[in-house]
Amino acid sequence: MDRNREARRVPMAAAGNGLSRRRHRAGSFRDSPEEEGPVELPEAARLRDRGGSNKKDRDRERDRDRERERERDRERDRLNSRSKRRRGERLMMVHGNLDDGGDDSSEESVNDDEEYDDGGVGPPSSLKMLPPTSNNISAASFSSSLSNHHNGGSGNLHHHHHSHNNNHQRKNNFPPTKVFRSSPSPAPVSPLVSTWKAADEMIGVSVPRKARSACTKRPHESWASSTTGGGVFASGEQIHRQISSTSPANRVSPASILASPSPPAPTSPSSSSISVRKKLPSGTKQKPLPPKSSSSKLSSPVAVQDEIEIEIAEVLYGMMRMPSTSKQEAAGNDLTEAAKSTVEVKSRVSSPISNPQTLPQSSITLAANSSSSNVSAIAPKRKKPRHVKYEDDNSSRVTTIKSEAEAPSKSQVPFSNQLKSSGSGEGNSSVLDSIIPLTRESNASLDSEKKENNLSKDETILPKVESSSGFRSDGEGAKSSSPEKEKFEIDLMAPPPVRSSSERGGEMMECVAAEAKPKVTEVETEAKPLLKEDRSDPAIHDSQEKKRPRMVAEAEHHKFERNCELKLDLDKSDHVGLVNKHHVQKPPPQQQLSVPDKTAQASHLPLHMSMPGWPGGLPTMGYMAPTQGVVPTDTSSLSAAAMQPPPHLLFNQPRPKRCATHCYIARNIQSHQQFTKMNPFWPAAAGSAPMYGTKACNLSLMPPTELQGSVLGRSSNPVQDKNSQSTSKSSETAQRNQLMLQQALPPGAANSILHGPTFIFPLGQQPHAAATIAAASVRPPNSGITSSGPTATSTSMNGSASATPAGAPTMSFSYPAMPGNETQYLAILQNNGYPFPVPAHVGAQPAYRGAPGQPMPFFNGSFYSSQMIQPPHHQPQKQHQQQLTGQMLQSHAPNNQNGSASTGSSAAQKHLQNQQLRPPINHGNSQGFPTHKVQSQPLNFQQRQQPRENATQHSETVGEDSPSTADSRGSRSNVAYGQNYGMQMQPTNLGLMSSPAPGGGVVGSSSSHGEKKSQQQVSKAGVESFQSPGYAMTFATFNGANTAPTLNMSSIAQNHAMFHSMPEAARQGYQMMAAQAAQQKMNYGASLEDGKSGSIGGAATANNTPEEQRKSGGGAIGKTSGGNGGQSIAFSNKQDLADASVSAVTSGSIVDSSSRLLNLGSALPQSSGSLPTSHHQQLLQQQQQQHMQRSQSQQPYTTMYLQKQQRYATSVAASAARTKGPVVSNGSGFPDHNMTTSPAGTTKFANANSGFPQNLVQSSSNQVQSQQWKNNSPRTTNTTQAQSPSMLSPSTSVAAASSLRNIPHKQQSRPQQSQISFAANSKPMTSGSPMQQVQGGTNHQAPSPPMLVGSPSTSSVSKNASGSPRTTASASSAANKGGQASTTTHSASQPSKNLQPASAASSAGGRNNGPSVLGNPTTSSGSKSQQQQQLPKHGLQPQAQLFFSNPYMQAQHQHQQQQITISPSGGYYIQRHQQQSGSAPAVPVTGAVTATSDPAKAIAAASAANNMKGGGGMGKTQQHQLGPPGFTNVHAVSSAVQVKPVDQKQQAGE
């Protein structure tokens, strides 16, 4: 379609002139210049082979596609007959324009129209129509093109192909066109046409072959870019592709740039455009253009057109040289092309409307390609000389046009994403209107409008405020401004020549603009319309740019070469680049664009900046003017470059090609990278306090810069930018615009933030918080610890730690109250991506905040949340929790970071996967406790965003781009925005982590505010409380309203991942805490066990339930469960991603998870309605499932499982819900509870909770999830999960979903399946036949995995893996039963500790069934709980455990005993953990896990964390090891085991 559109566009644009040119050009490129339509296909094939590097097969395919697309477009487009006519004749061209315009209308239509209008007074009417159509097509084409380009060369080729097809068609009609060109060859047209047609054929203005070739090729790139949906998105790939795939365009015509937007037409129209614009008064040309783009355009304005074509040829030639050079500087190679294209296009555009459209596209494409061009720097390179040559000729006009086009382009980059509608459409519309009446008038109007638009865009976008803004603002005066700016920029930018590539374009543009100023107002006007298009494209370009960071580097080098040629421009450009970078910081509008440009162009610049900045290169930072919290583009741009230099961990990852969120994430990542690079920081991270100092130093070092303006400046690093944003924002601007956040950050804050949450914009709403956040960010105690273990892992892998640290540090820094932690900044850290968790450490002084470290760890998503959450509660709770947890956590700091670490681990894994995952994962994970920072952020975002989770995804995500994305946005949004959406649930998470640093405690705390407080102290009672409130809190928190809940949530989330995950020990401790809380809550919840399920909605209820469960199951578990219930929500966040239920589950799970990471993970999803959850859980489960399914879409892999599972789970949940309602499988208890919560809170929270669980899940999933879910499934499911099954089901479902989400992202394979299976199965099982399942489970005990799969649950199970699904089903039953029994199971699980002996025995006995060693622990735990609850279940459990064990066994036998000791939660976790330990995945966890594992009990907490972390990792490993089968087995066993209990209980419940 894109190709078709492109072809159409080409036809329309090139209809008259473009066609001939294109065909000729194609002919030139191809062997036969004038292959007719029939030959066109082969030609196209050739074209593809050459230009698209597409093979003949592809060609054929494309031809077919082209045909299909054409037909589709035909059908799609209003101009069906026109399409035919277009094919049949010139009208086709018009149709192409119209069609293209139709699609592109949003983006290109306005611009095109405007340009067309500008192009000619007369032509605008007819032609105008074309442009709109063309634009529409372009819009559609743009998206598809972008997609295609993104997909690969195919899109671009497709466009080319379409163009060629259109060309064929046009060629069929071409004779007229050709004739027109030849016939009306008043010399200029003929030569130009000839040139366009065949570079050698005839060129009135002799165009050197090189120029021709370059024109054809490079312009083609632009054209392809443009054609491909405006080529903006296609830029990155397209440029690559374009270079390869340039042939078509190249063939099309040397003026392919012109033709580019409207493939063939643009060239001719471009020429015409120039002439026409000049000759605007003479409507001859213009009128000819409209009628039958080809015939009228060619016929009437044949002479003029020829003339124009000659002119265009000259301009193109010159532009290619000079503008290209300028543009190179401005936009890199692509920019050069864009400039060339813009200049000539603008000139051309001035005349023909068709050209304007085409040209604008071209221009945009070029602009976009500036990004892209980086990749295709080569082509631009060639162009450059020409440009240089031509500089004198067309310097003025081209320059002006280029400048204007470019500046607007840059300005518009951000908007361009919005389509050119905002600025472009706006300006273009007006301009168009103006233009239509009179070219001159139009020009003036256009200029002014453009000015306005540009200004608006600049202001809004932060593109090249300095560079573009000046002249752009001036509009007409822009010329003057431009020169001034040139000087200004030169001075400003003088320092970094490197920047020049980025700014080069801008500077060049300005320079050119200055030169061009005298030239022609018309040109300027034209340029402006083009600019608008350009502007629109830039955003896309940015994406492209991000896509091709490497290319960018090359391009930059090329640019440098070009710059050399354009010495003046280069200097200016450099200055401009610097200015832009610096200014970018200052002027948000300018910056954004600038930065994006830079991304493509400034690779090396950012490099240098980055490099130095990594610790110090913050120049980049400074350059990062865009800190803008948002300015993703900028971020992206810089980020990529900055990142690249230290590609540290992954970053290059921050491929600038992503959305703002992604950019931010990238930036954060970058920052983290820097930090990582600065490794001091890491050690510090481990070292915690030093972090601040050391890290801070390092971090700070650059962060101050970076964070502050610098970081912000580093906006170019999305990550950093974000970070800095966050920091600044938080700290200094927290309230101020978090966006700006940038400079003001307090040095400390900035530093801390710097890496930590990398974005950290804490969202903390209070500046304090921000500062706190920053501080915390810098040195999260947990972070530090976490950092040490996971940090390395996390650090390297994830930014998990980073985020965590951010959070922690926040805490540390927190004094402001911010529990600062919160700071949380979202902290985004996002770390997710960061390879290094900046974290955890970064602030890492566990001591600082004691508990706070954790929050940091959770860094990220929570951050916002937390932050959002007002630290008020947060803090106390958090601290309290942190104290509680802190001890545990701290002990687990690594673990905590396991939360973070685990998260980190997850994050690491995740992060690795995360970027892609991120959105999903972020969604899932992010939603939940951010598994990593990224997750966190997304988590936060997503949680907050939950609603937005999908979108965010997002996150960031984000980003993953990051995304997010979303992440960055959310993050960037900062408080409200990032936080908000993330906040929703995140706050809970935040709160969770924050408040219930321990996880449950806070959660409880949050959950019941009142309770929360008391329970908070309980340590985790809060957990429960926080479940509900958490959710609410989330929002409230975000708003600051419910800090507590948020806090709780946050805590939980954080805790959950961090705490829970983190410390198995903590978990144990947590459990203790939880136990405390649980007991405390138990009071509430004692009765709640099943009954409370109904209360799901209420945190208290949930809490109670969990409490009760806890009590029943064992205080810890119940409590955790309860707390988690509340927390669930928070966690659910993550899960919510997956499912609402997940939300609860997650939350609860997570919290509980702390106690039982497993539960966390397992319960997490399932636990949502822990108690209440049997039903509720199921309900939640359903929600969860829904969410999950939603999520699933997000995470395909997981999703699949998840979905399947979820479906089952849903059904189970539904049945359970129907039957039991909230009776959650208490086993999971809190998962159920979570579920419960989920429904009430989760539902809201679903996403949010999901987030957490995702985190958890992710954490869990990663660590726990896998282990939890894997284990959980098997083990937790078995044990906790047995009870959890229900929970698990939901939890698992959710968790699975989460896990899935996480896992798929992170370890998609292992936990995901297992989890999902498990979860899904649980539900189905529960739903379907708990008994059956039980039976199946029981029966299946041994074969459980398979059998279970076979079991009722099986459907789900089978899906998952044989065992898994069955297990799940079993688990589901069990879960339900467990849920009911869950309390017991859950309790048992958690209490497993309590029950542990029994559990162990049980495990030995029941679980022994399975490999005792392996199975035992898990089994024990689960078994015990379940056993206690229901021996039969236990029997089953053994199976489940067995299976579970198996994986565990495989992973780690040792744990099993320990695990047993650990208790379901602990045991499971531990097991999981150990597994993880055993497995690679546990990296972060590994240490903790290992230690924990062996010590198991002692380390239970750690183990928990480890488990969570390790579990996640391990789970992953397990899953991976076990693989779905193994996992499945495990799950199956779990399920089986659980099934029985579930059956019993569930039936009872149901």
Curated annotation (Swiss-Prot):
Q: Mind telling me which GO cellular component terms the entry cites?
A: nucleus
- When the coding gene is removed by deletion, what phenotypic consequences does the entry describe? Plants have a reduced amplitude and accuracy of circadian rhythms.
What is its subcellular localisation? Nucleus
Biased amino acid composition, Acidic residues: 100-118
Q: Where is the composition biased (Basic residues)?
A: 157-171
Keyword terms: Biological rhythms, Nucleus
Instruction: Tell me the GO BP annotations in alphabetical order.
Output: regulation of circadian rhythm; rhythmic process
Which residue ranges does UniProt annotate as crossing the membrane? none
Q: From start to end residue, where is composition biased (Low complexity)?
A: 134-151, 292-301, 367-379, 1174-1195, 1254-1273, 1361-1382, 1420-1435
**Compositional bias segments (type: Gly residues):** 1112-1126
Q: Which domain of life is it from?
A: Eukaryota
Task: List all Basic and acidic residues biased stretches.
Answer: 43-80, 447-461, 473-490
A further note on this protein reads: Called 'TIME FOR COFFEE' because it acts in the mid to late night, a phase at which any human activity often requires coffee.
The subunit field of the Swiss-Prot or TrEMBL record says:
Interacts with MYC2.
Q: Relate the protein's function as given in its record.
A: Regulator of normal clock function. Acts in the mid to late night. Contributes to the amplitude of circadian clocks. May act on the transcriptional induction of LATE ELONGATED HYPOCOTYL (LHY). Inhibits MYC2 protein accumulation, acting as a negative factor in the JA-signaling pathway.
- Its protein name is Protein TIME FOR COFFEE
Organism equals Arabidopsis thaliana (Mouse-ear cress)
